[in-house]
Amino acid sequence: MEKFYKENEGKPENKGRAEDEGSTEEGGKADEDKSDAEGKPARQGKLEVEGGPGEQAQQKGEGKPEKQGKSDGEGKRQGESKPDSQAKSASEARAAEKRPAEDYVPRKAKRKTDRGTDDSPKNSQEDLQDRHVSSEEMMRECADMTRAQEELRKRQKMGGFHWVPRDAQDALVPRGQRGVRGVRGGGGRGQKDLEDAPFV
């Protein structure tokens, strides 16, 4: 039963805890006095609203900080105004009504790509020049690639395709260039007949 109330601390739905609030406030004040003596920041708003026994509130205040980030008063000193902390605790209560602690979803972090947009004009001009140079280089490379592909096609036409039937080769290749050995006039096939080889 105690764990259930610890998970739902600070919610207005906690019923039957009004009797314990007086002891919580006393325990919260004792905790603040201890933190002032040690020189640590006091936890103001949340301990008054929590609604648990005073001893548990003190143990929780001295232990690990809450992961859900509900204690806004952690970073403040005792000397700051109390109405401000009460206003924050009221806004926290409204936020707790909207979404329970179990459904807590962290906010999205800022994307790192947005940081690079604030460059100086000098850097942006240099980047533009680099991009322009790189685009020219890409155009040259593209032209080189097309030339290389054309040369490859010519070589393939000259050398002959060994996997294409001979009748189809005749239409593609000029008359004197048909043989693999480069014999003038063709001189027959350059390789042994593959049709005569027995299948394994």
From Swiss-Prot:
Composition bias type Basic and acidic residues, residue spans: 1-49, 61-85, 94-106, 114-153, 190-200
Residue span of region Disordered: 1-200
One of the Pfam families matching this protein, by short name: BEX
Localization terms from the record: Nucleus
Principal subcellular localisation of the protein: nucleus
Entry GO terms, CC: nucleus
Keywords: Nucleus, Transcription, Transcription regulation
Function: May be involved in transcriptional regulation.
Family: Belongs to the TFS-II family. TFA subfamily.
Record-given protein name: Transcription elongation factor A protein-like 5
Organism of origin: Mus musculus
